[in-house]
Amino acid sequence: MGHEGATFRFTNDLDTPCTFYGYVGAQLLDAAGHALPTDVIRGGGYLFRDPGPELVAVPPGGSATFGMEWVHIPVGAETTCPTSSSIEVTPPDERTFLTIPARIMACGGGTLHVTAVQPAS
């Protein structure tokens, strides 16, 4: 079926609790740090069930997670798909992103399906 995915984890390294509500933003980057085509779709997909947005309280040292999936087989007229070297992830309701090394070959114009942030299990 060509689906791949990963679970990403936010860990609270502060001395105070923090909260999340909703979905992350994301931007795929090439090896030079330039933006690749990226289309973030909220709501999960084939690999990850979306719990929907809920307020997630994370105590100091605690974590929250979200799932991300993509298709790595060319879609429609695509013959190849760009592969990222890293990804910028923006937590819900934030403007500052985190850059994470990640080799992702997202076909379909860089389509990424994401779940809402949820408590880590």
Language model segments and positions:
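Solvent-exposed, conformationally flexible loop/turn segments
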Residues: 1, 59-62, 109
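Short, solvent-exposed loop/turn segments enriched in Ser/Thr/Gly
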Residues: 1-7, 80-84
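Asparagine-centered strand-capping/turn motif at beta-strand->loop junctions
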Residues: 8-15
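A short beta-turn/strand-edge loop motif at beta-sheet boundaries
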Residues: 16-20
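The feature marks short-to-medium sequence segments in extracytoplasmic or secretory-pathway proteins
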Residues: 21-59
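Short Pro-Gly-centered flexible turn/kink motifs
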Residues: 56-69
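Short, surface-exposed ligand- or partner-binding patches at beta-edge/loop junctions that are enriched
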Residues: 74-96
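Acidic, serine/threonine- and proline-rich intrinsically disordered appendage/tail regions
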Residues: 78, 96-121
